[in-house]
Amino acid sequence: MQPNSLIKRASFITLLWPEFDMSDGRLVIDVIDNGGQWTHREWRMLRYLGVDTKILPNNTAVENLRELDGLILSGGAARVGLTGELGNCAEYLELNIPILGICAGHQFMAGFYGGQAREAPAPEFGAATINLIDGGGPLFAGTPDTQTVWESHNDEVVIIPDGFVITASSNSCEIQAMENEKQDRFGLQFHPEVNDSEYGEKIFENFVKICERALKGPRGQ
């Protein structure tokens, strides 16, 4: 997408959602690369939505991060369910900004806050159907209760941390999504950045809105 299109897209967002005031500068939401094959798609999706975004390796020192309005922890080949390790993601989760974990990032988030991820009894690769629970929370706002998503994982979250709730489930994976809305922590087992996820763009739009609201709320004051 060309720069002019990105500017138009940002203007469209401001028109569609008045709470999005990008006149004083774009939101800054970076993507931590945990080795996932689709990390660049997450970056491209954010750019498409008018966000100032960069891809950073997961060994980036937390003090070298920019002043961020939000952060995405990408998926990756790391077996978080076996090792419990994922670069410097533990330090990133200490930041007082909204964070979205995708696949391995989601699994690591669960373990960091006291939940558990382990090897999945039924690994998923390809399209799957998920069902939202109680509307799915703010990350799924404006999407239907049943939707198709793209899966690619050997491990899965089996216990959510205290303070989190399950927001989406499927027949083969109980915890397809989780959130702690008070802490602005969101996890997705599936890959919303892949075209096969029907409402992936809407999910990214919702995360951008969450970051905007956090910036205007107590966190950003």
Locate each region found by the language model.
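Pocket-forming structural segment of enzyme catalytic cores
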Residues: 86-102, 107-202, 206-210
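Flexible gly/pro-rich beta->alpha loop and the following alpha-helix that scaffold active-site loops
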Residues: 26-32, 36-102, 106-107, 113, ...
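Active-site proximal loop and beta-alpha junction motif in alpha/beta enzyme cores
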Residues: 24-27, 188
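Short, Lys/Arg-enriched N-terminal segments with co-localized hydrophobic residues
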Residues: 12-21
